[in-house]
Swiss-Prot record:
The lineage of its organism: Bacteria, Bacillati, Bacillota, Bacilli, Bacillales. InterPro entries: UPF0178. This is UPF0178 protein Bcer98_3021. It comes from Bacillus cytotoxicus (strain DSM 22905 / CIP 110041 / 391-98 / NVH 391-98). Pfam families: DUF188. Belongs to the UPF0178 family. Coiled coil: none annotated.
Length: 152
C-alpha cells in the first residue's frame, strides 16, 4: 500500500465523521470532508468543502480531486467503482475495503436492484448502521493507516 496523503470523505450521509477525525488525527493524515450546502452543519471538525446541492456534485468533486495516494470514505458504490479504477483506496463506512475485483459484482447487483425498482419491485435496503459496523470501520481505518505509517 502506498502512503496515504489524505482522506476524502463523502460527508453528506456519512455516519462515522467523528471516528474519521479521531483516527485521522491520531495518524496525522489530512482529512477533507466534502458535502453539499444542503448538509451544512455547525458541528464541524476537520477541513470542509461545500459544493452545490445538485445531484452527484459531491461525487464529481471527490472524483476530480482524489489521487492514487488518497483514501476515500464513501457508501456510494458508483463513485467507488470510478475511484478504484484511478487507483484510489476506498473504504465504506461499514469498514469494507472496496477493490477493483469486487466492482463488477457490486455494480451488477446495483443495476439489478435499480431495474427491479423501475418495474415496481422493491428490494430490502441496507440494514441499519450498528455498533458492530462502527467498530468494524474503526478497526479497518486504523489498520489501513497503521500499515501506511509502518506501525503494524
Amino acid at each position: 500500500m502506498q502512503n496515504i496523503s489524505k482522506i476524502l470523505v463523502d460527508a453528506d450521509a456519512c455516519p462515522v465523521k467523528d471516528e474519521i477525525v479521531q483516527i485521522g488525527t491520531k495518524f496525522h493524515v489530512e482529512i477533507l470532508f466534502v458535502a453539499s450546502y444542503a448538509h451544512r452543519s455547525r458541528k464541524q471538525q476537520g477541513n470542509w468543502i461545500y459544493v452545490d446541492s445538485e445531484q452527484d456534485e459531491v461525487d464529481f468533486y471527490i472524483y476530480k480531486h482524489a489521487k492514487a495516494t488518497d483514501l476515500v470514505i464513501t457508501q456510494d458504490m458508483g463513485l467507488a467503482g470510478l475511484l478504484v479504477k484511478k487507483g484510489v483506496y476506498v473504504l465504506s463506512p461499514r469498514g469494507k475495503f472496496v477493490t477493483d475485483e469486487q466492482m463488477d459484482t457490486i455494480l451488477y447487483s446495483r443495476y439489478v436492484s435499480a431495474k427491479l425498482r423501475r418495474q415496481g419491485t422493491y428490494t430490502k435496503g441496507p440494514k441499519s448502521f450498528s455498533k458492530q459496523d462502527r467498530q468494524s470501520f474503526l478497526t479497518s481505518l486504523e489498520k489501513i493507516l497503521s500499515n501506511y505509517k509502518g506501525i503494524l
